[in-house]
Amino acid sequence: MSKITVILEKINQAKPLDFGTIFSDSIELFKKTWLQGFLLQIFTIIIMMPLIIVIYVPLIGIMLAQSEKGYPDPNPFANFFAGMSIFYILFIIVAVFALSTISFVLNAGFFRIMKKLDFNEEVSSSDFFYFFKSHYFNKTFMLMLATVGIAIVAVLLCYVPIFYALVPLSFINMIFAFNPDLSTSDIVKASFKLGNKKWLLAFGLIIISSLLAQIVGMIMCFVGVLFTAAFVYHPTYLIYKEVIGFEEENPVEVIE
């Protein structure tokens, strides 16, 4: 049997999972991964910084010029947007896709780190960059295109389908992280199969974990969001672990 057939069969035969158990296990796992989750946010901010500078620095310059005049003037903004060339817009679009692909790869590395910490294995910061290899970038770029395409179609269908698509899309990166040898279409297929099977459970956990991460982060003077933001990945990781599992178990330590 092919690998994708085995994965789909595991999803079909998946046992019921308990919301409370997954949520409490997510909190326990987060206690092991919070530092790596913080590093993930820092790396993501660093990667996105060039795009932020390109987009916002001109706007900041316009606002500073307005402050010198002492009164609001909409003309500079209108002139700025009117003067944006098609090449500049295309550059922004390409940059967004390129940087989003890099962010996607970083997240895949974080999922591998999460698994290692879950099984009490040693990790290092270099594990974030495990997928920073040329033969992975083409696939991750195609997965990004597929994700964006599905999201756009869902939004065009009066927004309601985006709530359905949210769950399957949240599994795409994870299935890639643990099955990078699968084709793009097989990864998307497995993600939607798993998302459909555990939709209500996963949707509830994603919403609750997102709210909890934001509330706790704001209580910690907003900077805490950098530490808590990655918590949202833990419930979906545990669903994947319980339904599909991993090819190799926690290695047994050999004492010489």
For the regions a language model picked out, list residue spans one by one:
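Interfacial aromatic "cap" segments that immediately flank transmembrane helices
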Residues: 16-47, 122-153, 169-217, 255-256
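Selective recognition of hydrophobic, aromatic-rich stretches within alpha-helical transmembrane segments
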Residues: 2-10, 85-119, 151-186, 217-248
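Repeat-unit-sized solenoid/scaffold elements
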Residues: 56-65, 119-125, 129-134, 233-240
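Short, small/hydrophobic-residue-rich motifs at membrane-helix boundaries and re-entrant hairpins
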Residues: 2-4, 10-119
